[in-house]
Amino acid sequence: AKNCILRTVHFLAEAAEAAGCPRGAISAISTPTMEATQELMKHKYTALILATGGGAMVKAAYPSGTPAIGVGAGNGPAFIDKSANVEQAVKRILDSKTFDNGTICASEQSIIVEQAMESAVVRELKRQGAFLLNEAQTKQLGGFILRANGTMNPKIVGKSCVRIAEYAGLSGIPADARVLVGRETGVGEGAPYSREKLAPILGLFV
């Protein structure tokens, strides 16, 4: 991840400089440590901190003396109502959730659908490559998403649908499934599909 970020920053910095930005306007710490991060946050030329990457990072930013915005855990739902372009909405949700197999915490974690739109949304999800789990599959995968202590199972993180199905002991999952969709009715600790899932897994609420 560090090398990917540094390479991305390199390309962004090159493009920014070519567009007229001062050299070094975009940069990154090449060897990230908490000490280096704290030094950067407290530097007199740092005007604003956007802290993400875990609770410890957010807590370290607030007392730094620099204005800070803390980012919490990502668990964003997408709401599809009667006015929506269903094809476009589903495409954007699936494109977001399949990027890097769902490891981006800002990607959608569940879909909330108005009852009148349920059939159209389910049909479009299937057409665009999502796999709708049946009740038994939903329950089985739901028991695998979280560990006994209530935290996300690291075995699902960034894995393909087929690999997740293999780990969870699910059968009948097609090799070309883009996202696994499980119906959910509750929220919170006892509702795994309502939680953050850094994997191509979505909860469906109607």
At which residue positions do the language-model features occur?
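Residue-level signal for inorganic ion chemistry
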Residues: I26, I49, E114, I164, ...
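Short, contiguous strand/loop micro-motifs
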Residues: K44-T46, A148, I201
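Short, conserved catalytic or adaptor-binding loops enriched in Gly and charged residues
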Residues: A18-C21, L170-I173, S194-R195
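Glycine/charged-rich beta-loop-alpha catalytic/anionic-binding loops adjacent to active sites
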Residues: G72-A73, K197-A199
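Short, well-ordered beta-strand elements within core beta-sheets of diverse protein domains
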Residues: S110-V113, L198-V206
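Rossmann-like NAD(P) dinucleotide-binding subdomain of oxidoreductase/dehydrogenase enzymes
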Residues: A1-Q88
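Hydrophobic alpha-helical segments and helix-packing faces
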Residues: V157, S194-K197
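ALDH superfamily catalytic-core signature
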Residues: A15, V58-G188
